Amino acid sequence: MLVYVVFGGMLATTWVQIIKALLLIAGALLLSYLVLQFHHFSFTQFFNAVAHADYGGSAAPKNLMEPGLKFGVAVAGPWGPLDLISLCLGLVLGTAGLPHILVRFYTVPDAKTARSSVVWAMAIIGLFYIMTTFFGFGAATILKKALILTADGKPDTNMVAPILAQQLGGEFFFAFISAVAFATILAVVAGLTMSASASFAHDFYSNVLHHGKENRPGQEVKVARITAFCVGAVSIGIAIYLGPSVNAAFLVGLAFSVAASANLPVIVLSVFWKRFNTSGAVAGLAVGLIASILLILLSPNGIYGKAGAPFPLENPGIVSIPLGFLAAWLGTILTARDPEAEAKFAELKVRAHTGLGSEKATAH
């Protein structure tokens, strides 16, 4: 990943993501087909099996259609329902603030193509999310507990989909799904690395440290490559520290919460509030980022553990997202108005809806 990000840039990353998307949808369609085939293509039989699943290999089958199996008060305690709402807020709102998704809009030639790409992305992503229902319920009804245990006897939830593919399609399909999962990880991490390196090189190095002045030719690209290497090295170190037992889906939920808390307030208020200014943007970003990370560290999965956690929720979104919006609002109203920026707001709205006046895409 580091090699093709550092030397290939956005073009190499884009091609990896295109190939990954095609393979991912193909593998998901085939796996969904095999799950339905196992249940004789009968939704009635499929959901009946879900309602009497040998959940996790337990002696007493559980009805997976019942509410509250993970976040119910009886299972997760009094904070369970609120934790579910917090998780959903992060997942829904965080999608609009993911930096490696936003940066894709710089790779299209015009606003019309950007809107078209959003429609296609929504359709493809929606289809995939529907198919995950078959993955999860299919694994619960087909796999046995012994198949997903690690060497130390703990369930390896990250390997459920490949093991399900192995059970239904054999070793070749297992290898294919594993390769698709690996390509997906590479594509996502590459997108994040590109976003981080480009932001540091262009926004911080050029505009903050050098005040927007022209640097030596190629210097910004060199800084971006060094940043990409550093980000990749730090990410690898964190992954090794966390180990294979951490559920990747849980980490994704936390990342979405951070994006929703820090990036979303700035994006929404920039588009819909005429008075919103730079001070509000900085305040919203800083408070949203700090609040979300701090609450994660103070959560039951943080540094104090489940017993002594000062913050009772595992997902911080329900607290950190409003804090981000509040800080952005306060940062704006407590500072002087910017008449020049407000005068350009009408122009911004026209450009946002029509694309008139927007910059053309450049070769990457």
Tell me the role of every PLM-derived stretch.
Residues L22-A175, G302-G317, A346-A363:
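Loop-to-helix junctions at membrane interfaces in multi-pass transport proteins
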